């Protein structure tokens, strides 16, 4: 379908050292705490309401690591497709996990570190990830990373409202009909065929 990587692909499974370095920088800045709350102690949204934030702990502890989000923290950005966005991060999402209790680094941290390492300037992805963007910008700001431009595309859903994706067992695209597939995608996005496709 004409989509090719500009550089070698980064695999999160090989990037643990880079994520640990970013965690150390966040901890040095006082932006993290370790949370030993069991599932039963967390509220319905998975938010820590205990005293973990105020206890003397380090990221070396074998517990989940959370970002400290000030209660008055607000994130604003202009999405290239969805328009101006404003999220009261401290009120709506609170202290989110950046490293899980099992030692795996959370998506929010991993994608921020990898985007910065690759010099990503524009992120184009599905609108189902729009609510992840404020958390990623929050981490970018605290790590002194540049914030890329974001464009969140509408996603195709099934009759039950599920995203049409591999995860939900959608059939794979037929590479033998790439031009037709691209035309369908462009029409879904209300875009005209580019000149190179007009006679394809």
Predicted regions and their residues:
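Acidic, metal-coordinating catalytic cores used for nucleic-acid/nucleotide bond scission
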Residues: 12-16, 129
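Short polybasic/polar patches that bind polyanions
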Residues: 27, 141, 187
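Charged phosphate-binding loop/patch that engages nucleotide di/tri-phosphates or the phosphate backbone
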Residues: 192-200
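Short, surface-exposed amphipathic charged segments that create phosphate/polyanion-binding patches used
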Residues: 21-27, 165-170
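A conserved active-site cap/scaffold subdomain adjacent to cofactor or substrate pockets
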Residues: 181, 186-188, 192
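Surface-exposed charge patches
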Residues: 24, 138, 184
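Active-site cores that bind ATP or allylic diphosphates and position pyrophosphate for catalysis
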Residues: 34-175, 193
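A glycine-rich helix N-cap at a beta->alpha junction
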Residues: 1-13, 22-25, 29, 34
């Amino acid at each position: 379908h004409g989509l090719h990587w500009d550089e070698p692909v980064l695999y999160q499974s090989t990037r643990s050292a880079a994520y640990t370095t970013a965690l150390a920088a966040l901890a040095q800045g006082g932006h993290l705490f370790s949370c030993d709350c069991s599932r039963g102690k967390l509220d319905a949204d998975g938010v820590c309401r205990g005293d973990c934030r105020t206890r003397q702990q380090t990221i070396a502890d074998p517990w989940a690591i959370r970002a400290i989000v000030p209660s008055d923290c607000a994130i604003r950005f202009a999405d290239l497709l969805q328009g101006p966005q404003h999220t009261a991060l401290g009120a709506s999402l609170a202290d989110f996990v950046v490293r899980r209790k099992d030692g795996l680094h959370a998506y929010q941290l991993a994608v921020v570190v990898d985007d910065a390492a690759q010099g990503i300037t524009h992120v184009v992805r599905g609108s189902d990830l729009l609510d992840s963007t404020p958390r990623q910008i929050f981490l970018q700001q605290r790590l002194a990373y540049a914030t890329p431009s974001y464009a969140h595309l509408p996603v195709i859903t099934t009759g039950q409202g599920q995203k049409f994706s591999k995860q939900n067992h959608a059939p794979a695209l037929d590479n033998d009909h790439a031009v037709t597939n691209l035309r369908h995608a462009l029409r879904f996005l209300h875009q005209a065929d580019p000149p190179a496709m007009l006679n394809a």
